[in-house]
Amino acid sequence: MKTPWKVLLGLLGVAALVTIITVPVVLLNKDEAAADSRRTYTLADYLKNTFRVKSYSLRWVSDSEYLYKQENNILLFNAEHGNSSIFLENSTFEIFGDSISDYSVSPDRLFVLLEYNYVKQWRHSYTASYSIYDLNKRQLITEEKIPNNTQWITWSQEGHKLAYVWKNDIYVKIEPHLPSHRITSTGKENVIFNGINDWVYEEEIFGAYSALWWSPNGTFLAYAQFNDTGVPLIEYSFYSDESLQYPKTVWIPYPKAGAVNPTVKFFIVNTDSLSSTTTTIPMQITAPASVTTGDHYLCDVAWVSEDRISLQWLRRIQNYSVMAICDYDKTTLVWNCPTTQEHIETSATGWCGRFRPAEPHFTSDGSSFYKIVSDKDGYKHICQFQKDRKPEQVCTFITKGAWEVISIEALTSDYLYYISNEYKEMPGGRNLYKIQLTDHTNKKCLSCDLNPERCQYYSVSLSKEAKYYQLGCRGPGLPLYTLHRSTDQKELRVLEDNSALDKMLQDVQMPSKKLDFIVLNETRFWYQMILPPHFDKSKKYPLLIDVYAGPCSQKADAAFRLNWATYLASTENIIVASFDGRGSGYQGDKIMHAINKRLGTLEVEDQIEAARQFLKMGFVDSKRVAIWGWSYGGYVTSMVLGSGSGVFKCGIAVAPVSRWEYYDSVYTERYMGLPTPEDNLDHYRNSTVMSRAENFKQVEYLLIHGTADDNVHFQQSAQISKALVDAGVDFQAMWYTDEDHGIASSTAHQHIYSHMSHFLQQCFSLR
């Protein structure tokens, strides 16, 4: 067994970062600690964002140039030399006042799309207004404007065609100043969705609002159509302004576990054949026969070339998926998807992929592709597939080991770039690697040794052909953004080092972060602790478990954060710990699939066991142990408190699930199967919070929910409240009027964290 790594964030400054091997953390003696007159990180600091972490959000526009917004000017940078020029003046944005929310440059750099009047809908979806700016004429285009309340808009990958969705129908502009061509006419609110996702596809499958995909040179536009006829509606009141005499009612087609699901169709239209005099009929591509035997999902779309596309389909029981590779026949003008180009992915122990099957990355000639799948030991690794599937053909794994590839970032003719957690055998780390395609033993970590104390958790943004890349070091030290050249990995320049924040934090007593593991049943389970300043292992501290614990989640990592836990540790001297038990991700399917078909069991037990293990470390006050979580974390919090373990004094559940039959079909059935007697109904019924109501008499409980939560409906907390009242349990509750799942409006955000802080102060007798 190798020595565990324990990561500390001293004062959070670059020079103060320390990586150690043994507990305790670096300590000051009692006199030095008492003499530390610096202020702490307060609740007001968190709520007002007093200390701002800077990032560097660039947008690549070629293999050697990127755009960056600075002082409201859009600057064009040369990656190699760092020189810049003004691409778009701030005066252009000033025309719209403060209403500009985003911009998008056409691939040929002739036009800029300006977004304003942004109105949020669900997690990813929104409506907005758009104007097109002509860069050659340096003026806005006033002809044939895009309608207000557009739901989605996107440039083609070459040139400057535009596709957009308005009132659930798709339109295409061949030229920005010319009239739009209407592609569909079947769109209907809450019923037929063309080119955009319905609620459940947006939230659980694509993680986006768009269901449009341009081909590489912009000839073809692919799109999905979702039909929610028959999908039951969730409805809730929206109270709005107090002058509204009757509340509004919001309706959303929302399939719950076992309910009628949306159906999906897939089409491709040739935009080069669009004209004002003839009608172009989109061509439909049907799902493979092996998934159309029952309910199924479209779960991935990827263009391979101008006349080849790959589609991934998934059965409703999400342990079987098929990738179909389809080719365009220029003679018959149809799309063919031969069974010899179908690739099947299955899971015998759980579900396909982490949340869905991973996307493929095709070689430039389209003859093969690389994809992250589980190897024979259950670890997610990169495998190479040939386009044409032969009987009994097995893909070739190019990575292997008891660690996981997180994502494929780029594929060139010579190398594949990916992020993994291999380094130091630390699941909560992230580093960038490249591997040679012709020699898989030629693998190199591009980030591991750059700044190993400050940087153990990286993200990357590569240029169009991966000639340059931006590394984003996100922890454990202050975030650092640098630009590199791929040929020799040379660092060309520092883009942002957060030195100003580093200087400010030198005057604040900041907590430290410890990342370590415990061994249970011969398996490593990782945890993190946010420890108070001047932590003294001979003292007893209150402990708050910060839990999520959903399938494929990870809370123990090497990332840097300034959040509520920073305040609790710095000012209130509370240890805030998170533990990744069974069901968590990035450590192999054995751990992740352990909770398959039994949510609310092992992941709940593991949080209780983690608290017991922390108590054994000697510095936790056994009479002051609490737990809190949001969403799935709220469910686990409630199940833990309702277990009657005697370990926890109090807890906070925000927007919790309470019964899995109340949650959406795609997420719930992925892990639980169907709520039918033939499948898994018994466990659906045995995993409710309400069934544990009697045990809440032993704990202090704060239940919180937003009344306009479109995701985890207020119904979930309402049923917990009803069960607790029926059981005669005294508890606290807080609702937030018209707030959704994030409870993120300015006033509600401040109120909820103030309220939760007061609850913990009372529970831990801190005031």
Curated annotation (Swiss-Prot):
One of its GO terms (biological process) is T cell activation. Monomer. Homodimer. Heterodimer with Seprase (FAP). Requires homodimerization for optimal dipeptidyl peptidase activity and T-cell costimulation. Found in a membrane raft complex, at least composed of BCL10, CARD11, DPP4 and IKBKB. Associates with collagen. Interacts with PTPRC; the interaction is enhanced in an interleukin-12-dependent manner in activated lymphocytes. Interacts (via extracellular domain) with ADA; does not inhibit its dipeptidyl peptidase activity. Interacts with CAV1 (via the N-terminus); the interaction is direct. The keyword Membrane applies. Inhibited by GPC3 and diprotin A. Keywords: Aminopeptidase, Cell adhesion, Cell junction, Cell membrane, Cell projection, Disulfide bond, Glycoprotein, Hydrolase, Membrane, Protease, Secreted, Serine protease, Signal-anchor, Transmembrane, Transmembrane helix. It catalyses: Release of an N-terminal dipeptide, Xaa-Yaa-|-Zaa-, from a polypeptide, preferentially when Yaa is Pro, provided Zaa is neither Pro nor hydroxyproline. Cell surface glycoprotein receptor involved in the costimulatory signal essential for T-cell receptor (TCR)-mediated T-cell activation. Acts as a positive regulator of T-cell coactivation, by binding at least ADA, CAV1, IGF2R, and PTPRC. Its binding to CAV1 and CARD11 induces T-cell proliferation and NF-kappa-B activation in a T-cell receptor/CD3-dependent manner. Its interaction with ADA also regulates lymphocyte-epithelial cell adhesion. Disulfide bonds join 326-337, 383-395, 445-448, 455-473, 650-763. GO terms for cellular component: apical plasma membrane; cell surface; endocytic vesicle; extracellular region; intercellular canaliculus; lamellipodium; lamellipodium membrane; membrane raft. Residues 1-6 are cytoplasmic. Changing residue 629 to R: Reduced activity. The active site is at 631 (charge relay system), 709 (charge relay system), 741 (charge relay system). GO terms for molecular function: aminopeptidase activity; chemorepellent activity; collagen binding; dipeptidyl-peptidase activity; identical protein binding; peptide binding; protease binding; protein homodimerization activity. Expressed in bile ducts and other epithelial brush borders (small intestine, kidney, colon, pancreatic duct); acinar structures in salivary glands; endothelial structures and T cell areas in thymus, spleen and lymph node. Changing residue 631 to A: Reduced activity. The chain crosses the membrane at residues 7-28. This is Dipeptidyl peptidase 4. It is found in: Cell membrane; Apical cell membrane; Cell projection, Invadopodium membrane; Cell projection, Lamellipodium membrane. Its main location: membrane. Its EC number is 3.4.14.5. Belongs to the peptidase S9B family. DPPIV subfamily.
